[in-house]
């Protein structure tokens, strides 16, 4: 009898601990421009490139009892084609024509400089997370150069630990805000059009 009771307690304790551990999440966010842009170009060609300047695809951890097992990541292979499509769409909205090999055309390089997800380290339950995204935009037009950094952040509170779909949406939202902020900078359109 005592043996069964002890076994039952061990089983319940094991399930409780498992409930506090979070598995890793590989996110596939969909960044999108979320505000209209003002056209300043007349269809001139622009070479558009994107790069991943992050030191690692890992954004951070989901926290919880064992944060080292709960990494959140976004791979460069997943995010770069989406950023390329959005950067080209932004250049079109600004009135220019994205062109892969245009000779002597202005160049715009969008670099994902930082993407972070931080949740409190203490405590068994994830109740909030801070997400930040930073892009660097480099524009070169003949001898003129411009470089700017554009960021966005988001603090989200949760009633329970967020699932993969929730984190994917939140990271996509913060990427979208930073991306839109970058292309709303009038200096970029002016530099491309000179």
Question: How would you name each of these model-derived features?
Answer:
Residues 1-20:
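Sec-dependent bacterial lipoprotein signal peptides
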Residues 9, 42, 129-131:
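A short, structural micro-pattern
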Residues 20-82, 187-194:
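A structural "domain/chain start" motif
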Residues 21-29, 94-147, 153-161:
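Surface-exposed short loop/turn segments
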Residues 66-78, 142-193:
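Short secondary-structure boundary motifs at beta->alpha junctions and helix caps
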Residues 73-100:
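Mid-chain, structured segments of secreted extracytoplasmic proteins
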